[in-house]
Amino acid sequence: MSFESKKPMRTWSHLAEMRKKPSEYDIVSRKLHYSTNNPDSPWELSPDSPMNLWYKQYRNASPLKHDNWDAFTDPDQLVYRTYNLMQDGQESYVQSLFDQFNEREHDQMVREGWEHTMARCYSPLRYLFHCLQMSSAYVQQMAPASTISNCCILQTADSLRWLTHTAYRTHELSLTYPDAGLGEHERELWEKEPGWQGLRELMEKQLTAFDWGEAFVSLNLVVKPMIVESIFKPLQQQAWENNDTLLPLLIDSQLKDAERHSRWSKALVKHALENPDNHAVIEGWIEKWRPLADRAAEAYLSMLSSDILPAQYLERSTSLRASILTV
């Protein structure tokens, strides 16, 4: 009996088609999803098992289609190592803000009544950020390429970062204003306060967008632009007007994350639109989710201040969304 001798495969042979030495990003990011190898049975279980049926319906049969999702590249080419280096610097900056402003007794100098606005309009944001975290994690799990999943998992970590900042700031304010209800009534506000109900409805419904493409579009092309333009930026403006100089700086750090999310979302849309059929699919999902997002923004802005004209912020959300869709 003789055995045919085969030439051993090179390291990272699955990247050979690139015809160049793979970068660190390529090595740790590309073609890592083995669940895409067999469309009839994504996972090594019965093809009719609940998990396989889920992936076949909500990933493989998604109307958002491309012949090679693995060709998508994160424009920032972040990996776990570089992400941690970058965010370690950001977290050091945020912690230094907390320390310095605490030493200056900043919270005692805000305009009277601002603490109640923060209790009502800021501290419940941690529920919204947790929704963003869960939604990003779902897209990460369902995405058809590991380069997409990597972007989503880092976005998930960013959402946890935002949530942590909000919880920390809430407790810090409660030490100066123990009677403002900070850290005590956020769940009740999230569930019952009229100004939060649009956001709660939006996110509870968005978390049931099981198709991976619809989940991505509704989250990154509808929800997140609305949060940037109709929550973060109005909060910054209101904070400045109420002598709160810490919150705008904190939000600036979070907006850096949001800008990165917009960059990779824009790159993924550009990649998806290599298939012309995807244009109508993406536009259809945006039109489905935009009314909910607009109503959520209007309710929140009306709660934040009676002097705010929601229309201008909705227009900015539309402009940000359009910039992501422009390829």
Swiss-Prot record:
One of its GO terms (biological process) is toluene catabolic process. Disruption phenotype: Cells lacking this gene show a complete loss of toluene-4-monooxygenase activity. It is an enzyme of class 1 (oxidoreductase). The keyword NAD applies. The alkene monooxygenase multicomponent enzyme system is composed of an electron transfer component and a monooxygenase component interacting with the effector protein TmoD. The electron transfer component is composed of a ferredoxin reductase (TmoF) and a ferredoxin (TmoC), and the monooxygenase component is formed by a heterohexamer (dimer of heterotrimers) of two alpha subunits (TmoA), two beta subunits (TmoE) and two gamma subunits (TmoB). Its EC number is 1.14.13.236. Optimum pH is 6.8. It catalyses: toluene + NADH + O2 + H(+) = 4-methylphenol + NAD(+) + H2O. Pathway: Xenobiotic degradation; toluene degradation. It comes from Ectopseudomonas mendocina. Keywords: Aromatic hydrocarbons catabolism, Monooxygenase, NAD, Oxidoreductase. The gene is tmoE. Component of the toluene-4-monooxygenase multicomponent enzyme system which catalyzes the O2- and NADH-dependent hydroxylation of toluene to form p-cresol. Also able to convert benzene to phenol, catechol, and 1,2,3-trihydroxybenzene by successive hydroxylations. This is Toluene-4-monooxygenase system, hydroxylase component subunit beta. It holds the Pfam family Phenol_Hydrox. Inhibited by Zn(2+) and Cu(2+).
